[in-house]
Amino acid sequence: MSAFENIAEELKKLRQLQGWSQEDLARNLGVSFATVNRWENGKTKPSRLAQEKIKQVANTGK
C-alpha cells in the first residue's frame, strides 16, 4: 500500500467513525468537498497544515 493509499484509507476511516459525509469533514476542516474527495481517492495528499487540522478534528470530533 502506498503512502497516498494509507492516508486515503485513514481519512475515510476517521470520517466514517464520526458518521460524517465528505461534505461534513470538509466543513470541519475548512476545505472544499472536492479537496476531501481527492484526498480519499488518493489523487492528492493533504498538506502538513491540513494533516495537523485532521489530527485536531480526529481528537475533538469537530
Q: Regions from the language model: what does each represent?
A:
Residues 1-17, 55:
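A short, Lys/Arg-rich alpha-helix, primarily the initiator
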Residues 19-37:
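Short alpha-helical DNA-recognition segment
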Residues 47-62:
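DNA major-groove recognition helix of helix-turn-helix/homeodomain DNA-binding modules
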